[in-house]
Amino acid sequence: MLILRGAPALSAFRHGKLLEQLTQHVPAVTGLYAEFAHFADVTGALTADEEQVLARLLKYGPSVPVQEPSGRLFLVVPRFGTISPWSSKASDIARNCGLAKIDRLERGIAYYVQGELSESDAQQVAARLHDRMTQLVLDRLEGAAELFSHAQPRPLTAVDVLGGGRAALEKANVELGLALAEDEIDYLLKSFGELGRNPHDVELMMFAQANSEHCRHKIFNASWDIDGQAQDKSLFGMIKNTYEMNREGVLSAYKDNAAVIVGHVAGRFFPDPQTREYAASREPVQILMKVETHNHPTAIAPFPGASTGSGGEIRDEGATGRGAKPKAGLTGFTVSNLQIPGFEQPWEVPYGKPERIVTALDIMVEGPLGGAAFNNEFGRPALTGYFRTFEQKIATPHGEEVRGYHKPIMLAGGMGNIRDEHVQKGEISVGAKLIVLGGPAMLIGLGGGAASSMATGASSADLDFASVQRDNPEMERRCQEVIDRCWQLGERNPISFIHDVGAGGLSNALPELINDGGRGGRFELRAVPNDEPGMSPLEIWCNESQERYVLSVDAADFETFKAICERERCPFAVVGEAIEQRQLTVADSHFDNKPVDMPLEVLLGKAPRMHRAVTREAELGDDFDAAGLELQESVERVLRHPAVASKSFLITIGDRTITGLVARDQMVGPWQVPVADCAVTATSFDVYTGEAMAMGERTPLALLDAPASGRMAIGETVTNLAAARVGKLSDIKLSANWMAAAGHPGEDARLYDTVKAVGMELCPELGITIPVGKDSMSMKTRWQDNGEDKSVTSPVSLIVTGFAPVADVRQSLTPQLRLDKGETDLILIDLGRGKNRLGGSILAQVHGKLGRAVPDVDDAEDLKAFFAVIQGLNADGHILAYHDRSDGGLITSVLEMAFAGHCGVELNLDALADSREELAAVLFSEELGAVIQVREGATPEVLAQFSAAGLDDCVAVIGQPVNGYEINLNYNGETVYSAQRRILQRIWSETSYQIQRLRDNADCAEQEFDALLDEDNPGLSIKLSYDVNDDIAAPYIKKGVRPKVAILREQGVNGQVEMAAAFDRAGFAAIDVHMSDILAGRVDLDAFKGLVACGGFSYGDVLGAGEGWAKSILFNARARDGFQAFFARKDSFALGVCNGCQMMSNLHELIPGTEFWPHFVRNRSEQFEARVAMVQVQESSSIFLQGMAGSRLPIAIAHGEGHAEFESEEALLEADLSGCVSLRFVDNHGKVTEAYPANPNGSPRGITGLSSRDGRVTIMMPHPERVFRAVQNSWRPDDWQEDGGWLRMFRNARVWVD
């Protein structure tokens, strides 16, 4: 084994943070230094050249001075017997660089901790430095040699039920954490008695997973008695009622990994499977929809819990039908009180938590990063979500209880697209090859399905921790590329049947695959790809290693499938074959036995149906009188409540422009304020139709009136989706995610009544269908605190997500108030008809109360009429701004509109209140409704339309937006409240700032927070030196010649499709080229005029951003020669964007005239930054930017490592003086800046784009390919038509070629 020292592992900021954490828990720690340590398992001595290549490979990341370490060594390495994702990718790169003697590379972090540490101190330090699920701590570097030793496989064990009977099974139930119910134990005893043999541990674990509440939804399929009355429908039956009442527009419901609804016809853009040239295929583009929860893992380990939650939901979408494509995501969190140190709020009363779970604050610091990181690396924009905190001590008939979310809700969902012919699964033929696609088996996530079905606290802490999975999004991206190549073959798609691997691992996925396909299966355990050879059969078969799919491919199609996998470098293995007989057999060639051999009927058949006998309990609540509250204090408290406050910290970490199909994200207007009501995507690049999604949830109401909370969740989803041009209300389809603490007094009945209110009453009345959903029935946390029993129980929680096809994405309404449209009015539409009920409101919560009467959907006809009128007014162009009323009430809706419009507001409340005592209820009640801005001249017509729809009593003109900074509320001729907008916006933003300060570079967080004080900030703006509508490439396109441009990608790249679309629009033939094509000699760059390296996460960025990709070119003779020859040609051009920019900056030795180019390293904020930033085009040599110099315009930014690090001050000066700096960040005032967030990565002198001296090669961190259409821009001027400002760049390249 070779040991190679690496660069320092922590930036100054991260170092300071970790040292602070360590000293807080172990005061004896006085200092810390950390560096990477690399270990190479070699088959022979390396030559001097090979040593040099290896040394260069392992030199990556920012240039930080290396120290001579001192202190006690804590070497954190992957667990022995495992292969980390870093190792597999780095080893791939080494092989591609010709280092054949390197069997494997692995990496650890060597922490040198200074201080007089006792053994107990050392144990505490070690615990805080590693993830015990995937890592261990050594005290010497040489100990890492054990990383490369291979453990012997552990054997199978049997449970002696024939001899030991029920007691043996009960013992196994506890030891293995199976969570089997009494009747399931009876069932297993009977089944194995009939088989005449003892069950193996693997069979019991498999049964427990497949039949867990998590997988089987026993409560939703149960029979019910409530108060002694038999109920005639199951919960699931009542949900299905919505489909039975209205099937229109639903293509697949309740039977696949996601539901499918009807979309629009468009030109679906992808490469031709034969020629590899991108083109549009005109066809129906159907919409798939799915929302999952990952609550249990997120409570234990928030980053991997939320990350794998998003990853699992993405796999659900990809594994729908015969293969589909995920498109846009959403994330939601509900947690208990945050209690941010130094920022504790008056309503937050500390209650404690069990050791096994993390705090609500930890969840909100780490969890969103996990969800965002997976979406970012996979390449899916995260476009909407929600965040709520709730934790309150309340009086009940059984005494005081704490209700809240110590077991959090972590929601991951999204939508995608699927071809019409692939909506339904195909047939599994006898003899079909059964395949595992994706990553290897690892000993992680064991028993996750069963664990998430228990109340937190009912299992041991070790089992809890073992049930959390770990993530590798780059692997999932490779799998998706394989699935994409398959569905793009149309009728020749080799996939006949596909499922994702989730809860229960292969033990759930493979039986489900063959069972759903009407077959049995014969499997070989040792064929399963396995990175931990020491695992037992149970561990191989049941672990929940992520990024895997199971599928069936007919023998005749196997070579096609194999070739696709090899080109995409995606691991796969044939693990079995389909058989006629409905038997499940798993053979183990190592031990020459059969760990599993049972009829599918025993595993998935007639397990006993659950019966619930429950009673209703009195509704809860307390008296809450808002009349006497001080208005200013109430406004400030409400604005600081996380459900109301800015969600910016959740949003800027997630890429919102990837795909180039995003028409409406969370950030609104020139000031990019996070207040959008819904997310909207375009169907494709050639149409204005699209898809919308939005969420609704009002969970605290369930403590007072559970059915009302369900109705309000649906109502809020409708009022949010009303902002999109949907058409008719019945076009909306819902996903319903149900959470409850089953078994807690009164909760089962509340759940039943809520499902009934939604499924049997409101949805049928609205004509809305719920074709998909999920349930989590163990929302309770129990623990002991110094001998005292404690528990936190969540309310019945329905989270609703609505999806709908959109007629015109350009007509998506936003809350941004407009001052450039003449005199205007604000109109309130109050669907509560003046009731202004405050029960369960944020106002009540911030004063430590619940209240009693809650908002409700009193009349479905009102909601239907509201939706129809808003859609009509939008179609007619009457609505300038729209915002629904929700958490925080009317005052919050109006303030958020003012924040987005950067203006003041004059409100007149005379029409809304009969007395001053009623003002608090008017301002803070959360009844359904909306505020719209219309031109003053259109107000009579708008009011008349509402009146004609029967909503006369619901509408009132309540004020006007005004120039300036003042928010004034007037009643009976006097001003009852006045405040400056910027002060209120800072209060609204402070919760987000406080979390950002803890999580990211605190200096950057402070700069962004202070930027809100700039009243004169003009926002985003456009100043062009060219005509955006002038198609300078048109004369060349008319010649019919389409020069070829290689759209180059490496494994992990995810931005190729929109890049191809931009070049295609400019008149190029865009060709899909994978690095594997070049390394194998299938493609020669001589055939191309242009080469574009696209954005993404090549090799998961394991050897530095873009560096592994670059080095696989530099140190591979064939690739190096090909690229060097291409760059030397005077008729060639190249572009590198984001990851492609990072990669090309490392190829400067091959690209003439680029010796001064920088290296791109971690952003100064230490965070992935996804923003719309202003850039100025410089006078430069770049062929792409000719005629654009002096232009200032917004552009999409999405990167974690975009800081330009020059080799020296001289190199920076050389770049500046050479005329090769092509783009710089500027602030909204137009000045070049290094200040955050206008310069999101902190690059010196705002530099974010450069070119070679002759201008043929340009690199840039921003993404022009995502905003070449006007409609792709988060904000755009009203006079832009089809073309966006950045299309000129691609047209310039087309002109240059001729």
Curated annotation (Swiss-Prot):
ATP binds at residues 305-316, 384-386, 676, 886. Its EC number is 6.3.5.3. It is found in: Cytoplasm. The keyword rRNA processing does not apply. GO terms for molecular function: ATP binding; metal ion binding; phosphoribosylformylglycinamidine synthase activity. It comes from the Bacteria. CDD domains: GATase1_FGAR_AT (cd01740), PurL_repeat1 (cd02203), PurL_repeat2 (cd02204). Residues 298-328 are annotated as: Disordered. One of its GO terms (biological process) is purine nucleotide biosynthetic process. InterPro entries: Class_I_gatase-like, FGAR-AT_N, FGAR-AT_PurM_N-like, PurL_large, PurL_linker, PurM-like_C_dom, PurM-like_C_sf, PurM-like_N_sf. Pathway: Purine metabolism; IMP biosynthesis via de novo pathway; 5-amino-1-(5-phospho-D-ribosyl)imidazole from N(2)-formyl-N(1)-(5-phospho-D-ribosyl)glycinamide: step 1/2. Residues 1045-1298 form the Glutamine amidotransferase type-1 domain. Keywords: ATP-binding, Cytoplasm, Glutamine amidotransferase, Ligase, Magnesium, Metal-binding, Nucleotide-binding, Purine biosynthesis. GO terms for cellular component: cytoplasm. The keyword Zinc-finger does not apply. HAMAP family: PurL_1. In the N-terminal section; belongs to the FGAMS family. Monomer. This is Phosphoribosylformylglycinamidine synthase. It comes from Pseudomonas aeruginosa (strain ATCC 15692 / DSM 22644 / CIP 104116 / JCM 14847 / LMG 12228 / 1C / PRS 101 / PAO1). The lineage of its organism: Bacteria, Pseudomonadati, Pseudomonadota, Gammaproteobacteria, Pseudomonadales. The gene is purL.
